[in-house]
């Protein structure tokens, strides 16, 4: 029988699977950001772990987003057809279309960061090993604009809006970081544009161009094309 792979059925060594499960559960513990360390984010293919479809919650969000966004066509064409919460989206997407890449990124970062911050609701399930895992719910752009969300929802909303502006999936990643100063995990968006320019967008309107915030350690990244586990290269004593 053809079974769509889930997080705990990936055909990877046990250590990599444990790292992936840990990274996914980390998304539940998001904090507001800290300040800048000296290593830029690198769009490296060496940490590739799996196709993005292996993470069902992420894949399901992308499917819901496509359906919901298709239903917004009337609103995007005519502001009068928008619901109250979608009017601002119409304005931003309409005005931002003709802007250069740098200004589109700044516009989206500011727009999304004004939205309501809500902690994600936790769901506890058992995997085949009998251990409890805590998956995170991924909100679509429409769901986020209607209800707010936590750090990964802010980051995903930016990702989806920039995709509408024509940014390639391969040039963006939702990145989970560990904030050593807060002793918690957080999500940011890495964006590559104009060749090799890379910016990291945070939830406090900061944009890191060449340096990441002090104490941030990259753990995990995802986009429409795949999942990257940055943590597998780190010596155990540094984790």
Regions found by a protein language model. Give the residues of each.
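A structural boundary/capping signal
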Residues: 2, 36-239
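Bacterial N-terminal signal peptides that target proteins for export
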Residues: 3-24
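N-terminal regions of proteins, emphasizing targeting and processing segments when present
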Residues: 7, 33-35
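Bacterial N-terminal signal peptides
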Residues: 23-33
């Amino acid at each position: 029988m053809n079974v769509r792979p889930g997080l705990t059925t990936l055909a990877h060594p046990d250590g990599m699977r444990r790292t992936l499960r840990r990274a996914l559960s980390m998304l539940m513990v998001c904090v507001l950001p800290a300040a800048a360390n000296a290593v830029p984010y690198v769009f490296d293919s060496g940490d590739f772990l799996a196709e993005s479809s292996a993470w069902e919650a992420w894949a399901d969000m992308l499917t819901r987003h496509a359906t919901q966004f298709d239903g917004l066509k009337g609103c995007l064409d005519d502001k009068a057809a928008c619901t109250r919460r979608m009017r601002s989206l119409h304005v931003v997407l309409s005005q931002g279309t003709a802007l250069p890449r740098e200004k589109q990124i700044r516009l989206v970062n500011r727009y999304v960061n004004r939205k309501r911050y809500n902690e994600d609701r936790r769901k506890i399930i058992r995997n085949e090993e009998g251990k409890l895992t805590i998956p995170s719910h991924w909100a679509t752009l429409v769901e986020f604009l209607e209800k707010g969300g936590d750090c990964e929802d802010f980051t995903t909303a930016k990702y989806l809006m920039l995709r509408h502006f024509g940014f390639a999936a391969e040039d963006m990643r939702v990145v989970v970081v560990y904030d050593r100063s807060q002793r918690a995990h957080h999500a940011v968006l890495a964006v590559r544009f104009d060749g090799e320019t890379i910016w990291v967008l945070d939830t406090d309107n900061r944009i890191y161009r060449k340096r990441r915030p002090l104490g941030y350690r990259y753990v995990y990244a995802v986009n429409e094309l795949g999942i990257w586990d940055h943590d597998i290269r780190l010596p155990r004593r540094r984790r």
